[in-house]
């Protein structure tokens, strides 16, 4: 998810609706106000990806606490790349656990344009 989309999603989580009459236009009500609430700050999925990338290389499972598929961060897409390369994932209550490939690490062609920071990790 692009940073602008992440910002809009977080604004909504805190009670501010953003209208999008056009792809390049954002409208916020004049008297919109943020609402205080408890909020679990997501870990940096970009940094977490190094641990997930070690899983197939070292051959051991890896889990980073509080990384979940519904993350606002686009870097979770990197985990799907690792799945396509033979890894298996399970979402647990406290994070995504990745298991190494059982039949070798597969190659492939991948589009990293939505999560370009991870191209070097791979």
What are these language model-derived features?
Residues 1-122:
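Short, structured segments at the rim of ligand-binding sites
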């Amino acid at each position: 998810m692009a940073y602008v989309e992440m910002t809009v999603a977080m604004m909504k989580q805190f009670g501010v609706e953003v209208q999008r009459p056009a792809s390049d236009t954002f409208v916020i009500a004049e008297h919109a106000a943020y609402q205080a609430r408890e909020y679990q700050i997501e870990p940096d999925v970009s940094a977490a990806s190094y641990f997930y990338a070690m899983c197939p290389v070292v051959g051991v499972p890896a889990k980073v606490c509080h990384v979940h598929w519904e993350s606002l961060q686009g870097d979770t897409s990197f985990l799907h790349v690792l799945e396509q390369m033979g890894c298996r994932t399970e979402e647990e209550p406290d994070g995504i656990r990745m298991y190494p490939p059982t039949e070798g690490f597969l190659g492939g062609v991948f589009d990293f344009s939505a999560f370009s920071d991870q191209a070097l990790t791979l």
